């Protein structure tokens, strides 16, 4: 069979799901029908659950991350709390040497804004709402606990990323999990070094899937729904044609990220403070408008924190915020 025929067979196979939907289906419906079984299959693998007692099942990946976070929290003597002031001082540039060029491509503040740009968003709002709806107000307590534990895991990730990164002659930097997995484990012997390379490749592949799925699709999906809602609902230009808005956003984001981390940082250090400001102000407005309900809410959070339903709801909320709503912060 010639190469052209092989490509024709492959292409026809890929288009079959679209053709079977019908001519009346919109592009959005065709894409959703084509992608849904794929995403469901991936989720079945990634979020495989294990029983934890009391009739509850929890994704294994969540248990693994929590175990690691708890270990690092105790190993580093609660660094997430103890080092909070130091972290602020670093971001403010207290330890910068004005006489020497710091290693790295961006400033401490730009690194922070780049990280926050992928953290503050859908997960922070939807994750909390879902946790409370499932486990009650007490679920909020467990989400705070999980957040503090996650900070310790983030600390070790960033530390290893800095320790094992590579700075090239042109000043650019390469680093991250793929580097500290391969280079770090190599110091533990040949066998561990080979394992590190395998894990590095696996992470890189998984990272692509995560960035396309949780990192992009979830965000643009929710943004599109809000846009359609405020521009007329079923009468909106984008109703049934959400791909148009998606294409526009893809082009805008593409122009930013194609310049690498420096280009991203230049945008985030201007946009993120404004974005976070709106986020915090909006939260304060809601709290101010419901001042009389705050004492009761705090009481319900504390009293319901150790209810089994609240604990489970908190775990699910953390899972949705950190994984299904995009694993940004950790």
Regions picked out by a protein language model, each given a short descriptive name:
Residues 3-122, 132-139, 150:
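N-terminal alpha-helical transmembrane segments of multi-pass membrane transport
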Residues 5, 67, 72-88, 199, ...:
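Membrane-interface loop-to-helix entry segments
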Residues 24-37, 44, 177, 215, ...:
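Loop-to-helix junctions at membrane interfaces in multi-pass transport proteins
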Residues 45-60, 228-243, 268:
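Interfacial loop-to-helix junctions that mark the boundaries of transmembrane helices
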Residues 56-62, 96-105, 137-138, 190-200, ...:
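Membrane-interfacial loop-to-helix junctions in multi-pass transporters
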Residues 72-73, 116-117, 146-173, 182-221, ...:
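Helix-loop-helix module between adjacent transmembrane segments
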Residues 99-134, 160-163, 169-185, 202-208, ...:
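Alpha-helical membrane segments and immediately flanking helix-loop junctions
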Residues 138-145, 265-268:
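Hydrophobic alpha-helical membrane segments of integral membrane proteins
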């Amino acid at each position: 069979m010639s190469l052209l025929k092989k490509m024709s067979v492959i292409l026809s196979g890929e288009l079959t799901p679209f053709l079977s939907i019908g001519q009346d289906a919109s592009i959005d419906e065709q894409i959703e029908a084509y992608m849904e079984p794929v995403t469901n299959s991936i989720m079945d693998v990634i979020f495989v659950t294990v029983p934890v007692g009391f009739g509850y099942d929890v994704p294994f990946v969540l248990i693994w991350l929590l175990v690691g976070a708890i270990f690092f929290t105790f190993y580093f003597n609660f660094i997430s709390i103890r080092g909070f002031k130091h972290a602020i001082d670093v971001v403010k540039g207290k330890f910068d040497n004005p006489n020497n060029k710091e290693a790295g491509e961006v400033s401490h503040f730009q690194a922070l804004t780049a990280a926050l740009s992928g953290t503050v968003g859908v997960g922070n709002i939807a994750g909390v709402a879902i946790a409370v709806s499932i486990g009650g107000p007490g679920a909020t307590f467990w989400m705070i606990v999980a957040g503090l534990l996650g900070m310790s895991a983030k600390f070790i990730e960033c530390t290893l990323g800095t320790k094992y990164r590579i700075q090239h002659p042109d000043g650019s930097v390469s680093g991250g999990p793929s580097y500290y997995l391969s280079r770090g484990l190599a110091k533990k012997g040949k066998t561990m070094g080979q394992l590190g390379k395998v894990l590095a490749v696996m992470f890189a592949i998984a990272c692509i899937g995560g960035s396309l799925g949780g990192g992009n699709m979830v965000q643009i999906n929710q943004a599109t729904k809000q846009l359609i809602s405020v521009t007329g609902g079923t009468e909106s230009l984008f109703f049934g044609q959400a791909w148009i808005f998606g294409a526009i956003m893809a082009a805008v984001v593409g122009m930013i990220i194609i310049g690498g981390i420096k280009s991203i940082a230049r945008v985030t250090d201007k946009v993120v403070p404004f974005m976070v400001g709106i986020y915090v102000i909006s939260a304060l407005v809601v709290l101010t408008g419901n001042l009389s309900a705050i004492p009761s809410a705090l009481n319900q959070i504390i009293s319901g924190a150790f209810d089994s339903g609240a604990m489970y709801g908190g775990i699910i909320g953390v899972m949705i915020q950190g994984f299904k709503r995009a694993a940004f912060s950790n």
